[in-house]
Amino acid sequence: MISGFSLISIISFILCITLGMTVYLKKVRYIFYNKLSKIFVVLCLTLALFWALIEFGYRSASDFSTAYSWLKLNVAWYFVMSFLLHFLLLYTENHHLLNRKIAYLIIYGPAIIFFLIDISTNLLFTNPVLESWGWTFGIPANPIIHSISTTWAAFTALFCLYVLLDYSEKLYNINKIKQTRIIIFGICIPIIIGLNTEWLFPILNIKFPELIVPSLTFGLIIMWYGIWIYSPLENKNYYEVIKTEVDKTIRNSGY
């Protein structure tokens, strides 16, 4: 059963894959030291393969067993939030935090815990439920762990916004200010939509499909547009960039 919302999920998958591969080919492949681009590529691919594609699978499933099989695969979306935080900490130059091992435990620890709980129990999600837009996940009768996971995801997103706002106040370069404002706009889209469809609507008992995947996809496109359009690197000739890297490699090899 393919609905309009199922199509939104598969379109998000295609856009994320395209965005991730575009960034890889333009940045990571030739600029070996660019950690920001590498994390962004991983973020895009994780969102595409472990969230958008799986969401399309269970939403468009023809029966309960197919939807159940797809939902059992929906256990790694937590890492999207971790990669998003890691990406924005890199962008905002929080190197003093990222140089500490404890920071990675804080960034990725909760995602690992929720991942392990999700693959071994039904404390986070239960059997699929058929709605007018397709199949969706069921909420446990005792939703404590589920509430903790969604609260963590919301807090992580809001913390990302705080990090960007704090960073923007310290900037003096006009292009960097404009770039950061675009990224702030990009992160606000999934925050506003996600807080409504994932948190407020369920509290008000309003049945509405989750839109965090397409909103985050759109947000990532806007974020990378801001980085790309105001990046000094884009004004350089790629030949010169590659030549510099090749020359450096030759010198280091001793030839």
List the model feature ranges, each with a label.
Residues 2-16, 31-122, 143-158, 206-221:
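Individual alpha-helical transmembrane segments in multi-pass integral membrane proteins
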Residues 22-33, 91-101, 162-180, 230-240:
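Juxtamembrane membrane-water interface segments of multi-pass membrane proteins
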Residues 129-146:
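Juxtamembrane membrane-water interface segments that cap and precede transmembrane helices
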Residues 2, 6, 54, 168, ...:
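Interfacial "cap-and-anchor" motif at the non-cytosolic start of specific transmembrane alpha-helices
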Residues 121-134, 203:
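Membrane-interfacial helix-loop-helix modules of multi-pass inner-membrane proteins that assemble, modify
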Residues 26-29, 57-62, 173, 200-201:
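Short, flexible helix-adjacent loops and helix caps
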